[in-house]
């Protein structure tokens, strides 16, 4: 029987640390899980790239053997750290053994701080769980094991001891004696092992092996991206911040002179007061609150709203993209984190990346100073920054599927792509409208946008937008054909598949009627039928967008794996339809472009535009 550091023994534990280090040679699969002291996890993201925090113990399971090896519990009960790490290193660096994690990025990141490289094929039960259902509310190990195994971790001793000590059972685990953590930690590894076995059956049953393999190969790419980070020119960043502050103050002064009062940029009430003082009208929400959309402010003819927009951009650049970046810098490098797939920390249902700590995907694209902010991002020393953009990636994917579906008019658009013509100009010619309108309407169709939202974007009446959308669908039939085909598929079977077989599910239901200005919550089928009676699948109007976004994710992720495995290049950053890398020469840049254009064969040619320069801003 063991006791904690403070010799409080109300809650007791029978758990003892292991005394053996069995060989894992010949084992096909081993599951590994880490317990950590990661005190800045919730505020700054995982601490491993910044060397903030530590590993307090490692659990391992081969199914028939499971053990937790504590090495740095502040409460005591630790084993010889050198012996443990030598053993864990021998297992992790044996490339004949497949390794399983639940959230692999986190665990292999922390293992790297112990100078342990995880070799062999990487599996992730978190990735498998998301591929099997991207619409879950929770992806924790407990949630997944409860659903698939009917098991979960026994946290009774851990929680009771933590409560006795006045600690948080998860965040403060490192402060506790290992005997109160051991049973919980062992379950982490054993349940991950058992869950992996079950999920692989489900992955095969759902024909998701190909996309699962790609996602697993991508784990190592993203880990290396995060570990290396991006060089940041902080001197340039601070100089730019001063320039932005001066410019913002000029706009604020001009607004004060114009309206006779201070304007708080991010307060709709303050902006409304400023509008009132100069007798300008503005829209309101359904509940009557002032509403200032970006489109409204940018397209207004008066000076005031345009100044509000410009000042907001300058303010956000300072707060989000200079101060926001600066606090994450470690040794002049930024280690932003990527949500590879849907999970408890974020991610998207489509398979596209999301980023956090910080979220670089919010970087403004069309802004005078957005380019200046990007100039603080540098390639590796002595190398060049390549920014490679897919040209009209989503319209090309739409056309690819329209051709496979034999939609009328799709061949004409394919021929335009082959000739290097612009997609939106082609649809504009087909609809006999200006390119600007064709682009807005076409993207609206792809994104499932209704005519009311389109009316706002085009600054026309809802009835005009409705008529224009109807005419567009008639004259550009391949888009309407795809929209209807994908929606019908989603309605009939509840799923659609992307370019590489990723499933998009529509498994929630809503009333089969519509009442203006009334919100109905979507629910699982039985619950919805009990609540509403006559129901239909929810969200199927987004099916085409899900297909295109998910396929774009497939193409982009396949590119990243190929660039890493075939060229030995670890990307710096991936945003939207853009891949950024550090390359040694123009030739390497051309090699990246070639892989991007040919990684997946489409019914239309993929086109990539790229620049090789000295920083991100100049390459964009």
Language-model regions: role of each:
Residues 203-213, 555-579:
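Active-site palm subdomain of RNA-directed nucleic acid polymerases
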Residues 63-99:
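Nucleic-acid-processing active sites and adjacent nucleic-acid-binding tracks
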Residues 38-41, 105-116, 128-132, 272-279, ...:
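Short active-site loop/helix that positions an aromatic residue
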Residues 475-476, 594-604:
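A common structural junction motif
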């Amino acid at each position: 029987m063991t006791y904690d550091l403070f010799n409080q023994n109300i809650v007791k534990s029978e758990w003892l640390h292991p005394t053996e280090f069995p060989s894992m040679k010949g084992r096909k699969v081993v599951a590994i899980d880490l317990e950590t002291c990661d005190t800045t996890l919730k505020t700054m993201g995982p601490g491993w790239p910044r060397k903030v925090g530590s590993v307090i113990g490692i659990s391992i399971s081969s199914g028939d053997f499971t053990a937790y090896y504590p090495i740095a519990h502040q409460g005591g009960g630790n084993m010889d750290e050198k012996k443990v790490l030598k053993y864990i290193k021998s297992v992790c660096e044996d490339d004949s053994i497949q390794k399983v994690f639940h959230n692999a990025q986190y665990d292999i990141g922390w293992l790297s701080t112990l100078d342990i490289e995880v070799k062999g094929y990487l599996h992730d039960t978190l990735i498998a769980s998301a591929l099997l259902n991207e619409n879950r509310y929770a992806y924790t190990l407990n949630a997944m094991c409860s659903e698939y195994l009917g098991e979960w971790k026994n946290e009774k001793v851990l929680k009771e001891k933590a409560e006795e000590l006045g600690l948080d059972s998860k965040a403060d685990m490192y402060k506790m004696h290992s005997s109160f953590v051991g049973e919980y930690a062992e379950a982490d590894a054993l349940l991950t092992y058992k869950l992996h076995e079950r999920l692989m059956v489900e992955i095969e049953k759902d024909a998701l092996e190909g996309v699962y393999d790609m996602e697993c190969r991508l784990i190592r790419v993203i880990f290396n991206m995060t570990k290396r980070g991006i060089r940041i020119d902080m001197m340039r960043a601070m100089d730019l911040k001063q320039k932005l502050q001066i410019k913002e103050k000029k706009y604020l002064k001009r607004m004060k002179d114009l309206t006779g009062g201070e304007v708080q940029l991010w307060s709709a009430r303050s902006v409304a007061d400023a509008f009132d003082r100069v007798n300008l009208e503005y829209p309101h929400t359904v509940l009557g609150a002032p509403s200032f959309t970006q489109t409204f402010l940018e397209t207004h003819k008066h000076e005031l709203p345009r100044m509000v927009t410009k000042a907001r951009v300058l303010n956000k650049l300072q707060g989000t993209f200079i101060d926001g970046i600066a606090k994450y810098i470690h040794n002049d490098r930024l280690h932003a984190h990527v949500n590879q797939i849907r999970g408890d920390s974020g991610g998207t249902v489509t398979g596209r990346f999301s980023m956090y700590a910080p979220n670089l995907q919010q970087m403004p694209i069309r802004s005078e100073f957005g380019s200046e902010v990007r100039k603080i991002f540098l390639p590796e020393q002595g190398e060049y920054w390549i920014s490679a953009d897919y040209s009209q990636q989503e319209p090309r994917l739409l056309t690819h599927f329209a051709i496979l579906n034999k939609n009328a008019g799709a061949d004409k658009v394919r021929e335009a792509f082959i000739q290097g013509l612009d997609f939106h100009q082609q649809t504009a010619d087909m609809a006999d409208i200006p390119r600007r309108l064709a682009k807005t309407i076409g993207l609206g169709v792809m994104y499932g946008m209704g005519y009311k939202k389109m009316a706002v974007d085009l600054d026309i009446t809802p009835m005009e937008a409705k008529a224009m959308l109807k005419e567009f669908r008639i004259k550009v039939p391949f888009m309407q054909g795809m929209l209807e085909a994908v929606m019908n598929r989603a309605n009939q079977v509840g799923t659609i598949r992307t370019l590489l077989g990723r499933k998009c599910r529509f498994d929630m239901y809503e009333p089969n009627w519509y009442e203006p200005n009334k919100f109905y919550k979507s629910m699982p089928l039985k619950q919805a039928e009990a609540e509403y009676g006559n129901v239909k699948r929810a969200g199927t109007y987004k099916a085409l967008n899900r297909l295109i976004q998910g396929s774009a994710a497939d193409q982009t992720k396949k590119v990243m794996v190929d660039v890493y495995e075939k060229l030995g290049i670890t990307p710096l950053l991936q945003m939207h339809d853009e891949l950024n890398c550090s390359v040694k020469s123009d030739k390497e840049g051309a090699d990246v472009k070639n892989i991007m254009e040919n990684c997946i064969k489409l019914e239309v040619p993929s086109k990539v535009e790229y620049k090789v320069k000295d920083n991100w801003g100049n390459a964009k």
